[in-house]
């Protein structure tokens, strides 16, 4: 009897699991963009679309009116709503048979599709040190962002996003907003007092061809052929497996051979004998001082005196930017780590770690491409309350392990078409006001080609959204790179010219000139509001 009971339980459990895991295309479903808190584009006809049972009747109730359609044989449906004036909040009900979805807190205003690479992706938290007041005063339910998940698909355009939601700006949530897009939205809102929505589809390091459709890239045979190549899942797995094995092996060997971890007293501990350690002036690159030291790990340490009035207080340890990766210790305690060169190093020092008198900072730096060190003209300091202790100057240093250069990896997600299919295509039915674009750094190695690629991207997107010549606003690349005393060749200058030519050639485009907003030593300048 017990056996029969157990078998019955297993049977019903199996049935339950099967029913739960069956595809839900037969159920009423909306795309992730059409959800609570969405901002709809004013003054244009609106697409509301989704999925249901095949041939099922669909109704939408919105602002006192009802709209009808019938799902096709595949269960797809779309209802076109008439033009709406700015306002809200509103509710919308979508019904199919006995199923009903109610959407809350809908606003109507202007919606902008913001895309590009890292300078568009760069969130407000990265620029927080110079915009503290703007963050404190950011609360505004009429400014919202929808962050598109960062994914790729080389085989076909997708029709929905895996997740995502509309988020209103406030001092906490705004930290994850694109800084460029947020300040743009804030400016529009303050001028016109209408809701502003940002659909943020951006990814650091991405070249322009990754955002273009397969059809558009037929005019660029090398990119089109590359897109075909990456339809092969086995190829992607092989590339990623080999890259991962090689990279993991390099870092494993580095750790294994690092003298700083071989001793009874690891080098991150205080009171290590450093009598044979040479010195180096920080900031700077160690190969400029010690040409024989290139790739691998190098340990740095510096002693600082803390007065009794500051002892035990929390602090901020600011270490500018470091190439490539670093791990930081204070008085033998781990404080933080950063795995690649671009983010600013801002580490929180907890209370009770700093002591009166002598304190010691240790930084283990990893260089994998031959130019490791501390980027010049950045702040290196320990900040406690209103006191700033300068950390530039002489540091003790010693190489932990010498390594061969680590060859670069293939970033599959940057290959042609992939981001378009997964991050652009699902958004194209959603009505928008226009496009915001900050990109070009990743194409600077072929700057003349950009004067063909950028106009084609604009044409490509305008065709796909099917809203006519939607405004396309973009940022011209800012100044970047070491100052030179004589005129010289510059790919960035040529790419800026390509951007200018696009402005002159393509109607309804706008270009923000940012030549005075860059930082020579940082590809991610902070001044995103200006």
Where is each model-derived feature located?
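Aromatic-lined ligand-binding clefts that engage carbohydrates, nucleic acids, or primary amines
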Residues: 49, 277, 304, 310-332, ...
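Beta-strand-rich ligand-recognition modules
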Residues: 64-87, 321, 328-381
């Amino acid at each position: 009897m017990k056996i029969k009971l157990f078998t019955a339980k297993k049977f019903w459990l199996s049935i339950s699991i099967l029913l739960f895991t069956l595809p839900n295309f037969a159920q009423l479903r909306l795309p992730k963009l059409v959800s609570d808190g969405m901002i709809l584009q004013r003054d244009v006809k609106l697409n509301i679309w989704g999925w249901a049972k095949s041939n099922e009747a669909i109704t939408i109730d919105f602002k006192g009116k009802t709209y009808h359609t019938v799902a096709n044989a595949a269960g797809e449906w779309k209802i076109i709503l008439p033009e709406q004036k700015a306002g809200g909040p509103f509710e919308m009900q979508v019904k199919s048979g006995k199923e009903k979805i109610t959407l809350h807190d809908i606003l109507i205003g202007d919606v902008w599709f913001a895309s590009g690479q890292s300078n568009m992706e760069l969130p407000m938290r990265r620029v927080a040190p110079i915009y503290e007041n703007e963050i404190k005063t950011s609360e505004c339910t009429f400014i919202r962002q929808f962050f598109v998940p960062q994914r790729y698909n080389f085989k076909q355009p997708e029709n929905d996003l895996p997740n995502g939601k509309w988020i209103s700006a406030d001092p906490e949530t705004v930290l994850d907003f694109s800084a460029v897009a947020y300040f743009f939205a804030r400016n529009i809102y303050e001028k016109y007092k209408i809701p502003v929505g940002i659909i943020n589809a951006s990814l650091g390091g991405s070249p322009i061809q990754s955002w273009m459709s397969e059809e558009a890239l037929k005019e660029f045979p090398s990119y089109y052929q590359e897109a075909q190549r990456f339809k092969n899942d086995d190829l992607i797995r092989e590339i990623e497996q080999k890259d991962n094995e090689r990279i993991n092996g390099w870092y494993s060997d580095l750790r294994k051979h690092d003298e700083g971890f071989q001793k009874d007293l690891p080098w991150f501990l205080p009171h290590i004998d450093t009598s044979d350690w040479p010195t180096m002036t920080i900031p700077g690159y160690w190969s400029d001082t010690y040409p024989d030291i290139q790739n691998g790990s190098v340990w740095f340490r510096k002693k600082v005196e803390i007065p009794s009035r500051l002892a035990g207080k929390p602090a901020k340890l600011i270490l500018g930017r470091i190439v490539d990766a670093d791990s930081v210790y204070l008085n033998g305690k781990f404080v933080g780590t950063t795995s690649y060169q671009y983010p600013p190093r801002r580490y929180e020092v907890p209370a009770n770690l700093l002591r009166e008198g002598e304190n010691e900072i240790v930084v283990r730096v990893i260089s994998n491409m031959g130019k490791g060190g501390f980027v010049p003209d950045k702040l290196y300091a320990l900040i406690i309350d209103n006191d700033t202790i300068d950390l530039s100057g002489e540091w003790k240093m010693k190489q932990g392990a010498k390594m061969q250069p680590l060859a670069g990896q293939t970033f599959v997600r940057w290959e042609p078409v992939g981001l378009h299919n997964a991050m652009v295509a699902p958004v194209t039915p959603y009505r928008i006001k226009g496009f915001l674009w900050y990109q070009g750094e990743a194409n600077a190695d072929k700057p003349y080609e950009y004067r063909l690629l950028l106009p084609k991207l604009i044409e490509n997107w305008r065709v796909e959204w099917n809203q006519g010549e939607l405004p396309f606003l973009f940022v011209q690349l800012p100044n970047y790179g070491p100052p030179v005393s004589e005129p010289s060749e510059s790919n960035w200058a040529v790419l800026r010219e390509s951007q200018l030519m696009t402005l002159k050639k393509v109607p309804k485009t706008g270009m923000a000139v940012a030549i005075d907003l860059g930082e020579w030593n940082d590809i991610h300048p902070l001044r995103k509001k200006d």
